[in-house]
Amino acid sequence: MRLGLFGGSFDPPHVGHLLVAQDALEALRLDHLLIIPAAQQPLKGAHQTSAHHRLAMVRACFEGVQGIEVDPVEIERGGLSFMVDTVEAVRRRWPDAHLHLLVGRDVVPTLPRWHDVDRLLSMVRLVVLTRDAAPQEGPLLIDAESDSGVVAEVLSTRQVDMSSTEIRSRVRDGRSIRGFVPDAVATYIASTGLYREYPRGSADTERSERA
């Protein structure tokens, strides 16, 4: 069984996340892809929308998408979200699965700061997501820690010019987010009043800066 893991703050989840997940599911020939919202990311700033709101939005975003499941493992565990702990929990559920961990290219430089990164990378195949216009073929060598390196697959996904930061800013400024998020997510944001008073300059939380 080929199982993918796609984690992040998803604050909020948007169409780009949805397209990337679908591209990964197809291109990597995954049997299943887990979307894993973080409870609290160690490498992110303090301001983050509450976990129950983000989980509800992620479920709305991916509802009905075949092959994709929202897994609340990190939110249910609480505290700081260390990916190595999440992977171990997933392995206990699917001991025979081949695990593929999806991360954004912008996250690669943070790998040396991830908690117990060597053990993490021994349990998964790392897949680096890129939105380059021209797909890069072949493996990518990443300096994971000190002088060591890991070989990762590079997956070129559809280019989507949007970010969670931009969406939060648009909501705060009273502008439309139609086309940025699925309708169900837009409805949730409107009904709960999320992001209307979100602080300016908040760090982008959209893609997998884990630890």
Curated annotation (Swiss-Prot):
GO molecular function: ATP binding; nicotinate-nucleotide adenylyltransferase activity
Catalysed reactions listed for this entry: nicotinate beta-D-ribonucleotide + ATP + H(+) = deamido-NAD(+) + diphosphate
Highest taxon, organism lineage: Bacteria
InterPro entries linked to this entry: Cyt_trans-like, NadD/NMNAT, Rossmann-like_a/b/a_fold
Function description: Catalyzes the reversible adenylation of nicotinate mononucleotide (NaMN) to nicotinic acid adenine dinucleotide (NaAD).
NCBIfam families: cyt_tran_rel, nicotinate (nicotinamide) nucleotide adenylyltransferase, PRK00071.1-3
Protein name: Probable nicotinate-nucleotide adenylyltransferase
Organism of this sequence: Gemmatimonas aurantiaca (strain DSM 14586 / JCM 11422 / NBRC 100505 / T-27)
Lineage: Bacteria, Pseudomonadati, Gemmatimonadota, Gemmatimonadia, Gemmatimonadales
